[in-house]
């Protein structure tokens, strides 16, 4: 049954027999699609594929967890890694939607973007903002941020997106692009409490 196979896959992994572990995990996925181990097994498969740059296979494994929804304890990390799998395939728009999904999930948990949470939470959120900045800088900068949120709806953390994008450009010494990022936010949100700070940059 699935528990026997699951234990077998763990045993193989612990002694470094990764290929055998993968073969067993693939059996679990095919033969026991309702297994209670499915999300963990799919996450381990996703990590295997991702580290070997098999991003399409990784995407498929992570997506199967995301499709389960927040009921899975692997949901958030799978959503994040799904974003990266798409990003590595240069599917920037699809990747952005997944990374924004990570931030949306954080909103539902009551995460405070100003104060942050635990070190692990803050690191993942910071990394998510960083890769979102990379994605928007690859696809046209602040105007693509405007387009994205016009299409997908406003978010409470939009200010962080613009701020991180501006900071990303500053690090690259792209000063005009940095200024455009801050000014675009101010233009769209003139009454936001951060707007005066952005206006001075």
Residue ranges and their predicted role:
Residues 1-201:
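Acidic, polar-rich low-complexity tracts and alpha-helical solenoid repeat scaffolds
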């Amino acid at each position: 049954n699935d528990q026997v196979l699951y234990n077998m896959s763990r045993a193989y992994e612990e002694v470094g027999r990764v290929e055998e572990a993968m073969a067993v995990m693939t059996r679990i996925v095919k033969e026991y699609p309702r297994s209670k181990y499915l999300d963990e097994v799919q996450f381990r498969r996703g990590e295997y594929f991702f580290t070997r740059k098999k991003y399409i296979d990784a995407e498929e494994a992570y997506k199967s967890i995301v499709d389960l929804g927040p009921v899975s304890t692997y949901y958030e990390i799978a959503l994040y890694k799904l974003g990266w799998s798409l990003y590595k395939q240069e599917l920037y728009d699809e990747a952005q939607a997944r990374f924004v999904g990570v931030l949306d999930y954080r909103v539902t948990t009551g995460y405070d973007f100003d104060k942050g949470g635990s070190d692990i939470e803050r690191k993942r959120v910071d990394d998510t903002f960083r890769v979102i900045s990379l994605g928007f800088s690859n696809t046209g900068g602040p105007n693509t941020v405007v387009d994205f949120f016009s299409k997908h709806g406003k978010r409470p953390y939009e200010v962080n997106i613009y701020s991180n994008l501006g900071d990303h450009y500053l690090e690259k010494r792209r000063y005009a692009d940095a200024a455009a990022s801050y000014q675009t936010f101010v233009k769209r949100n003139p009454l936001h409490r951060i707007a005066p700070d952005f206006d001075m940059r």
